[in-house]
Amino acid sequence: MRQNDNEKQICPIPGPQGLPFLGNILDIDLDNGTMSTLKIAKTYYPIFKFTFAGETSIVINSVALLSELCDETRFHKHVSFGLELLRSGTHDGLFTAYDHEKNWGLAHRLLVPAFGPLRIREMFPQMHDIAQQLCLKWQRYGPRRPLNLVDDFTRTTLDTIALCAMGYRFNSFYSEGDFHPFIKSMVRFLKEAETQATLPSFISNLRVRAKRRTQLDIDLMRTVCREIVTERRQTNLDHKNDLLDTMLTSRDSLSGDALSDESIIDNILTFLVAGHETTSGLLSFAVYYLLTTPDAMAKAAHEVDDVVGDQELTIEHLSMLKYLNAILRETLRLMPTAPGFSVTPYKPEIIGGKYEVKPGDSLDVFLAAVHRDPAVYGSDADEFRPERMFDEHFQKLPANSWKPFGNGKRSCIGRAFAWQEALMILALILQSFSLDLVDRGYTLKLKESLTIKPDNLWAYATPRPGRNVLHARLALQTNSTHPEGLMSLKHETVESQPATILYGSNTGTCEALAHRLAIEMSSKGRFVCKVQPMDEIEHRRLPRGQPVIIVTGSYDGRPPENARHFVKWLQSLEGNDLEGIQYAVFGCGLPGHHDWSTTFYKIPTLIDTIMAEHGGARLAPRGSADTAEDDPFVELESWSERRVWPGLEAAFDLVRHNSSDGTGKSTRITIRSPYTLRAAHETAVVHQVRVLTSAETTKKVHVELALPDTINYRPGDHLAILPLNSRQSVQRVLSLFQIGSDTILYITSSSATSLPTDTPISAHDLLSGYVELNQVATPTSLRSLAAKATDEKTAEYLEALATDRYTTEVRGNHLSLLDILESYSVPSIEIQHYIQMLPPLRPRQYTISSSPRLNRGQASLTVSVMERADIGGPRNCAGVASNYLASCTPGSILRVSLRHANPDFRLPDESCSHPIIMVAAGSGIAPFRAFVQERSVRQKEGIILPPAFLFFGCRRADLDDLYREELDAFEEQGVVTLFRAFSRAQSESHGCKYVQDLLWMERVRVKTLWGQDAKVFVCGSVRMNEGVKAIISKIVSPTPTEELARRYIAETFI
């Protein structure tokens, strides 16, 4: 049973005694509020209460209490008095909105993907542009000119966020001696908000002149924001694909709404203020600490010299700057530039076991004190020591002990942007200059508004020998006119015909197929393809007068997550609502489900049938691919060639182009940011990778991840991992085409492509992260190679591989285009032809093997590492994602997204008394480890558990009996009953070789649970599932097929 909160002893919250009317205003030094509050916090650890300006604040000073407040099921953001004053300028923008406000949810869903890791990475050139302007100014001023560091960092960070997010240039470094009017108004606005927050309301109301000045400042800032919007609309830069473009053009996939003009202004102002103010403070404090800690400055400069040297700083260098990364972390620990955040409980709560708080109470997290909690950071918590923030130490810190970017869904969405910007600027400064304080006796004093910065911090910047920034920049400009090292992929455009390609996809396969089809349609015909999820169709209006192609999967008879509303709409149609719609449907079947006749291909079949019944005209019969047995790219290509194109030619009077490179001319394709594969993924950090198996068997690894606050999963859910191709595969391509890894590719395309366009990208990055290098070559790509072959014998052989010998030699040996090009030289094939023939890199899905309630904010994966192909080939055909995960080390960054489980593949809720039977082999144990962990948590909460059996198959106890000790402990606690089958040690499992043998041996107990309405969950290979299903059907006979389908739920993999 759960403990009764009423039994806890309630204690008053301590704090300094205030004065009537004035409260605690005399306890705070208003000129040094942060540091004087820190003294109070050390006296009243871990919590205190005081009254300021008529507002009572409960201040949190410890990591333990903060951890409670970070539970978003108990607490939510409180818009404190200071933020309430900011609302006069930003209204319900992302930072100042209340949780319940509609515009916050709308803006958050639209804009979070715009700050995804790949989008941030692509902003590096613009960041570098502004940072070089800072360095050029310092170089021109010379070593004897005092520099106001805070002012210059303010110019840098404002110009950076404006250029990267909105394509707007403030040109702050070209307005000599003065700030842009926006900055002046912003500084006054923030300072006034801080001032009003310290004054009783009756005094604040008398400050008429100050209020008038504030309104003028708000008007000026919002006018600047309107000018930014107007300029974008007038220039019609619809290919910018930046934050402003997202705000102006995107619609929310959940509600269908777009941001209003006023909401756009609110959020532009929010980003311009919050997007530069705290980052300029971070840089200022970081440089201050380096200037006053010579040992740290020397180490930092040494690291930059080792990693970057005299090269131009690139995005690849940043991940290698471990010490600089630690410097920034340690700086924000000691001086969090956004000093805190506030929450309030949903209902009365007891925190710390004895302090009562109520809804409406302002619980203010004082980060400067929390980050110095001696219980976490020790006796030297007040000292600047970057070494404590190296990855290996940082990852071992207790949860919620470092929170400079806030918490949960209300945390800063621009964190990755700010981090990349600050790291790059700091590295560029240390590469180019030696710094020294103007006043070597300088004592830190804070300049406080609603953020904090050093006050009156001046330094000299002496250019380092051989590091002339001006000469380097001129050299870059000169070199940019030469073609060497710059490869541009440009294509012609032709008179076009629109086409719409819709997809439904949980795992990314159908999305990748949709993009591949778009490329093909733009090459063979004259189509301009719009690719989007089915649920993205506005008002469910399918376009007429153009082909509509639908590519979708079916998940146990249910539509994919991004197709549910579309399917529901289809089912509501009446009469000939779809008359004039010309369509075709391609369906993917999940492995292991083809024998459920009622669900296999159910959704594609349903869509195809309903559209025909309501007046739609089929362009082609429905196509399909069983992903357990077929290569979906090959099947899609075959269906397109044999079925779709004849239908398109007849319906749209087309003449097909015979493209020699397999892709031909390109057409522009606009992919909305929430659905591009990379924008849809977030950043997770690897905590641990450990091998679970003996060296004598297939390797399986346990990967522990720290998840972003935005990912909240349940047992049974999956993580989609966007991998990188191996270095070996990338190097094979580079060697084949004789180009360097740092060769810059500039892809200009006005057509369907999943590649990054209109931005420089290195050959290494493109090949690593955007295309499938090991995908089996398709017949079309082989015919394209044959057409380009200059040798007749090679051409004939390639043509044979595309036809008669395809199944046995290409598909049978898993030959990729790379394998074939290495074996059969086709000199006329260039890198752009090759890249265009490759499908986009798609995410791989893994079931989470942990319960979120056991370790909040963390998840684990159990991965079977495919180290070689099951069948022979000319090369080691290692699994891309599994080897990528196995090669990770603590601190590695992964791109992940949450994929919800089949609603039936869920652990029954706490109120359910039905037993469960779990059956797994190998890494298929992943979801059941999560189930068992969740059951253990419930048991500790006093919940009576229904019976649970886990049947697990592996080779031998000493080889691959995964999580043995952990599961045995759970069995001893009564959480689960275990049954193991050892295929190579049958004597140790009662003569049973496989799990189906074990099930049959225990058939009496299994049937008993079945009679209690048990559900059977299975996870493993297709073959294992087939054997288990046959045995279960035999044990529970004569159960009706429909009931068996309802109570037998399987997840299978190939």
UniProtKB/Swiss-Prot annotation:
<comment type="function">
    <text>Self-sufficient cytochrome P450 monooxygenase that catalyzes the regioselective in-chain hydroxylation of alkanes, fatty alcohols, and fatty acids, giving sub-terminal hydroxylation by acting preferentially on the omega-2 position. Produces 10-hydroxydodecanoic acid as a major product when dodecanoic acid is the substrate. Produces the omega-2 hydroxylated product, 12-hydroxytetradecanoic acid as major product when tetradecanoic acid is the substrae. Prefers fatty acids as substrates, since it hydroxylates the small amounts of dodecanoic acid formed in the presence of an excess of 1-dodecanol.</text>
</comment>
<keyword id="KW-0249">Electron transport</keyword>
<dbReference type="Pfam" id="PF00258">
    <property type="entry name" value="Flavodoxin_1"/>
</dbReference>
<protein>
    <recommendedName>
        <fullName>Self-sufficient cytochrome P450 monooxygenase CYP505C3</fullName>
        <ecNumber>1.14.14.1</ecNumber>
        <ecNumber>1.6.2.4</ecNumber>
    </recommendedName>
</protein>
<dbReference type="InterPro" id="IPR036396">
    <property type="entry name" value="Cyt_P450_sf"/>
</dbReference>
<dbReference type="GO" id="GO:0070330">
    <property type="term" value="F:aromatase activity"/>
</dbReference>
<dbReference type="InterPro" id="IPR001128">
    <property type="entry name" value="Cyt_P450"/>
</dbReference>
<dbReference type="InterPro" id="IPR001709">
    <property type="entry name" value="Flavoprot_Pyr_Nucl_cyt_Rdtase"/>
</dbReference>
<dbReference type="InterPro" id="IPR001433">
    <property type="entry name" value="OxRdtase_FAD/NAD-bd"/>
</dbReference>
<dbReference type="InterPro" id="IPR017972">
    <property type="entry name" value="Cyt_P450_CS"/>
</dbReference>
<dbReference type="InterPro" id="IPR017938">
    <property type="entry name" value="Riboflavin_synthase-like_b-brl"/>
</dbReference>
<dbReference type="GO" id="GO:0050660">
    <property type="term" value="F:flavin adenine dinucleotide binding"/>
</dbReference>
<keyword id="KW-0274">FAD</keyword>
<keyword id="KW-0479">Metal-binding</keyword>
<feature type="domain" description="Flavodoxin-like">
    <location>
        <begin position="499"/>
        <end position="644"/>
    </location>
</feature>
<dbReference type="GO" id="GO:0010181">
    <property type="term" value="F:FMN binding"/>
</dbReference>
<feature type="domain" description="FAD-binding FR-type">
    <location>
        <begin position="678"/>
        <end position="908"/>
    </location>
</feature>
<dbReference type="InterPro" id="IPR017927">
    <property type="entry name" value="FAD-bd_FR_type"/>
</dbReference>
<dbReference type="InterPro" id="IPR003097">
    <property type="entry name" value="CysJ-like_FAD-binding"/>
</dbReference>
<dbReference type="InterPro" id="IPR023173">
    <property type="entry name" value="NADPH_Cyt_P450_Rdtase_alpha"/>
</dbReference>
<feature type="binding site">
    <location>
        <begin position="585"/>
        <end position="620"/>
    </location>
    <ligand>
        <name>FMN</name>
    </ligand>
</feature>
<keyword id="KW-0349">Heme</keyword>
<dbReference type="InterPro" id="IPR008254">
    <property type="entry name" value="Flavodoxin/NO_synth"/>
</dbReference>
<dbReference type="InterPro" id="IPR039261">
    <property type="entry name" value="FNR_nucleotide-bd"/>
</dbReference>
<feature type="binding site" description="axial binding residue">
    <location>
        <position position="412"/>
    </location>
    <ligand>
        <name>heme</name>
    </ligand>
</feature>
<keyword id="KW-0560">Oxidoreductase</keyword>
<dbReference type="GO" id="GO:0020037">
    <property type="term" value="F:heme binding"/>
</dbReference>
<dbReference type="InterPro" id="IPR023206">
    <property type="entry name" value="Bifunctional_P450_P450_red"/>
</dbReference>
<dbReference type="InterPro" id="IPR001094">
    <property type="entry name" value="Flavdoxin-like"/>
</dbReference>
<keyword id="KW-0521">NADP</keyword>
<dbReference type="Pfam" id="PF00667">
    <property type="entry name" value="FAD_binding_1"/>
</dbReference>
<dbReference type="InterPro" id="IPR029039">
    <property type="entry name" value="Flavoprotein-like_sf"/>
</dbReference>
<comment type="similarity">
    <text>In the N-terminal section; belongs to the cytochrome P450 family.</text>
</comment>
<keyword id="KW-0285">Flavoprotein</keyword>
<keyword id="KW-0813">Transport</keyword>
<dbReference type="Pfam" id="PF00175">
    <property type="entry name" value="NAD_binding_1"/>
</dbReference>
<dbReference type="GO" id="GO:0005829">
    <property type="term" value="C:cytosol"/>
</dbReference>
<dbReference type="Pfam" id="PF00067">
    <property type="entry name" value="p450"/>
</dbReference>
<feature type="binding site">
    <location>
        <begin position="505"/>
        <end position="509"/>
    </location>
    <ligand>
        <name>FMN</name>
    </ligand>
</feature>
<keyword id="KW-0408">Iron</keyword>
<keyword id="KW-0503">Monooxygenase</keyword>
<dbReference type="GO" id="GO:0005506">
    <property type="term" value="F:iron ion binding"/>
</dbReference>
